[in-house]
């Protein structure tokens, strides 16, 4: 994954009922659907969709802070909505998320100077993100315990191209698909563990998949 580790089944079914090729609704839906990497703004939210091009992945921007992603035998992808630049804000999200294999639902983002990729993992599939990571302790936040980890990626994709950078992880011990994440608690916990955060780039509530299939419909605020 762009990490330890990308979107048309449910959307196309609805489109078949509500919109026909050439209709205004069909054209508008097509504008919102993405199958290749792209970033931008939609309904006041920043969105980011990155895919390595493997398998079938369709990302669709919905109303407000909502997005949908469907994937089938994907390579690796990360997609979601949020903010650019990020801040130490409380992030609220809700919806449905499921995968038959390796995937994460997380508050995800980057900093620069230093270049850091960070994850606050709310739920994950068959692959435990703590595998091979250095455990740095725990933090209590939003009614749960999160385990803190650090890893290093070498010559990997990043917001600055191929680079070597650290990943910071905060992994919730009890999985969930809705709630509020007080991001400041996690940023402070990483700092207290001796990890340096740089200047905030973007932060999204992300769905990520790696060599798996699944679907997600998430609303952020």
Curated annotation (Swiss-Prot):
- Gene3D superfamilies given for it? 2.60.120.180
Task: Tell me the compartments it is located in.
Answer: Secreted
Which residues, if any, are the signal sequence? 1-19
Q: Which UniProt keywords apply?
A: Carbohydrate metabolism, Glycosidase, Hydrolase, Polysaccharide degradation, Secreted, Signal, Xylan degradation
The EC number(s) given in the record are 3.2.1.8
User: PROSITE patterns recorded for this chain?
Assistant: GH11_1 (PS00776), GH11_2 (PS00777), GH11_3 (PS51761)
According to the UniProt record, one GO cellular component term is: extracellular region
Catalysed reaction(s) here are: Endohydrolysis of (1->4)-beta-D-xylosidic linkages in xylans
The biological pathway it contributes to is:
Glycan degradation; xylan degradation
Please list the residue ranges annotated as the GH11 domain: 33-221
GO terms in the biological process aspect are:
xylan catabolic process
Q: Does the keyword Oxidoreductase apply?
A: no
Belongs to which family?
Belongs to the glycosyl hydrolase 11 (cellulase G) family.
Protein name per its UniProtKB record: Probable endo-1,4-beta-xylanase B
Record gene name:
xlnB
């Amino acid at each position: 994954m762009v990490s330890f580790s990308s979107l048309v089944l449910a959307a196309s079914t609805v489109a078949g009922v509500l919109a026909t090729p050439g209709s205004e609704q069909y054209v508008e839906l097509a504008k919102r659907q993405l199958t290749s990497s792209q970033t931008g703004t939609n309904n006041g939210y920043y969105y980011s969709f990155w895919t390595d091009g493997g398998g079938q992945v369709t990302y669709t921007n919905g109303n407000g802070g909502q997005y949908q992603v469907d994937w089938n035998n994907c390579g690796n992808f990360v997609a979601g909505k949020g903010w650019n630049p990020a801040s130490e804000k409380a992030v609220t999200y809700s919806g449905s998320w499921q995968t038959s294999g390796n995937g994460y639902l997380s508050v995800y983002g980057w900093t620069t100077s230093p270049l850091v990729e960070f994850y606050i993992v709310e739920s994950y599939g068959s692959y435990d993100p703590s595998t091979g990571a250095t455990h740095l302790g725990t933090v209590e936040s939003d009614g749960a315990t999160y385990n803190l980890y650090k890893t290093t990626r070498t010559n990997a994709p990043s917001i600055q191209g191929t680079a070597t950078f650290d990943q910071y992880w905060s992994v919730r011990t009890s999985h969930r698909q809705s709630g509020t994440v007080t991001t400041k608690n996690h940023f402070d916990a990483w700092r207290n563990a001796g990890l340096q955060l740089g200047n905030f780039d973007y932060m999204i509530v992300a769905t990520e998949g790696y060599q798996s299939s699944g679907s997600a419909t998430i609303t952020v605020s």
